[in-house]
């Protein structure tokens, strides 16, 4: 009568790839590969004295870019936990409690070194852009489902409550002019020209809902549903709304007059259905009712 299901999953990813040096309009290992097939084959990466070649644009060559201290790194961590507890106190009645927790965090680092070429010039000031994002999603449901069959009558009733919540935060920072490629950390860069930013969002929704389905002899169908939903994405006074619906159906192919007419048997299952209801939609921005919504300082 009592059943518990738990599902756990996680993912840890650490991606590290070369990137281009400072002041170049290109970035990432894909750009390095693309430029490598376009550069003249006789362009030297190293001079006879071991220093880096200038390249046709005085910015080095794709090979020297791939070997320099620039890098792009992504640390991504994901965790999901879902649990379902089901209880059947009597025949036809099932009670369920469902919950879920999802966590995700991502850190991105884009470091561009100042690569020194053979004539002593640098490609541009070193710089670091760092971005951090974390998101937490939670959900909870209570469900009661009842099924009963009395001769030719089939009845199904469902009632439930649902709640979900998501919160996300992000933070970014930028600095340049690092004294050494051995310390690619924001606090090691120069304070002049530094940039920072951040943001986030929150949303939540809760619902009460129910449904009744009646079926007589697999021929006549009746269904009614009702929802009372509330969303944080709407302003005070308009957060909650009621959404009813009703539907009727007639499976004509189960009638005796249909089955007794061989000329109609090319329709193995013919059902007529009519429905009417009210729908809602909260797939909008998180703060559309705010004329101004800005985080920061002057």
Task: Label every PLM stretch briefly.
Residues 206-216:
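Structured alpha-helical segments in the cores of large, soluble enzyme domains
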């Amino acid at each position: 009568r009592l059943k518990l299901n738990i599902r756990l999953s996680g993912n840890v990813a650490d991606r590290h790839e070369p990137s281009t040096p400072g002041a170049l309009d290109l970035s990432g290992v894909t750009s390095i590969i693309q430029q490598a097939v376009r550069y003249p084959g006789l362009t030297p990466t190293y001079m006879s004295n071991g220093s880096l070649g200038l390249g046709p644009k005085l910015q080095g060559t794709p090979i020297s870019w791939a070997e320099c201290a620039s890098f792009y790194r992504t640390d991504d961590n994901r965790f999901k936990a879902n649990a379902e507890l089901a209880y059947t106190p009597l025949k036809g009645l099932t009670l369920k409690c469902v919950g879920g927790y999802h966590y995700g965090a991502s850190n991105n680092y884009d470091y561009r070194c100042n690569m020194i070429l053979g004539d002593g010039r640098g490609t541009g000031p070193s710089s670091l852009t760092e971005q951090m994002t974390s998101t937490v999603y939670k959900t909870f449901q209570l469900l009661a489902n009842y099924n009963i069959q009395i001769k030719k009558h089939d009845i199904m009733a469902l009632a439930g409550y649902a709640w979900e919540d998501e919160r996300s935060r992000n933070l970014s920072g930028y600095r340049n002019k690092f004294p050494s490629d051995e310390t690619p950390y924001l606090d090691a860069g120069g304070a002049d020209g530094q940039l920072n930013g951040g943001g986030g969002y929150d949303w939540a929704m809760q619902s009460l809902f129910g449904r009744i389905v009646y079926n007589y002899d697999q021929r006549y169908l009746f269904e009614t549903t009702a929802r009372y939903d509330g969303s944080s994405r709407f302003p005070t006074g308009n957060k909650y709304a009621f959404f009813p619906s009703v539907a009727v159906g007639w499976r004509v192919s189960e009638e005796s007059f249909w089955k007794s007419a061989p000329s109609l048997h090319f329709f193995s299952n013919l059902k007529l259905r009519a429905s009417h209801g009210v729908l809602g939609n909260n797939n909008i921005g998180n703060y559309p009712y705010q004329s101004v919504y800005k985080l920061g300082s002057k």
